[in-house]
């Protein structure tokens, strides 16, 4: 279908692609055979074994790095931070084009310390990794949290640029 519609790539997004890993793996292998690029939009929380399997067939990944504390990850995501950081590093080391998106949530991951830790991590992996800071809007189970102030996003962008990150974007 992608070739018939003259697509240049296939992206798995909106639903975590690792939740249907076998399908994305089979599709990625077919895509590569047909000269199509492949992109994961992912939370980055997958086993190292899964990443090792998909990496040869994955051209790019946008990883939603939700915060920089394990407390944040365990309380809000019921997960852990370290596997995500390790997978970002591995993707980069494997030659996968990596971009990172951080949804900045007031009172949760927007402190100067949190933002500095995120910027430091990205810069240490590679200052050429595009970094996207996006604005939180109240919804569903977090409807009591205020939208991210634009000034907070501007501050995050400034911190990232000062750390030498070359491609820093603010969105939403």
Regions found by a protein language model. Name each.
Residues 1-148:
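Conserved AdoMet/S-adenosylmethionine-binding subsite of the radical SAM
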Residues 145-172:
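A C-terminal junction/extension of Radical SAM enzymes
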């Amino acid at each position: 279908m992608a070739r018939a519609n003259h697509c240049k790539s296939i992206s798995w997004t909106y639903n975590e692609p690792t939740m249907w890993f076998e399908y994305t793996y089979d599709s990625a292998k077919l895509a590569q055979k047909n000269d199509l690029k492949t992109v994961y939009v992912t939370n980055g929380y997958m086993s190292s074994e899964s990443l090792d399997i998909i990496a040869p067939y994955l051209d790019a990944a946008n990883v939603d790095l939700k915060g920089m504390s394990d407390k944040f990850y365990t309380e809000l995501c019921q997960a852990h931070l370290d596997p995500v950081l390790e997978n970002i590093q591995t993707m980069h080391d494997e030659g996968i084009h990596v971009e990172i998106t951080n949804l900045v949530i007031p009172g949760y991951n927007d402190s100067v310390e949190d933002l500095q830790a995120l910027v430091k991590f990205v810069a240490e992996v590679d200052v050429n990794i595009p970094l996207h800071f996006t604005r939180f809007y109240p919804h569903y189970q977090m409807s009591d949290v205020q939208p991210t102030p634009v000034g907070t996003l501007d501050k995050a962008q400034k911190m990232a640029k000062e750390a030498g990150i070359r491609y820093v974007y603010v969105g939403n």
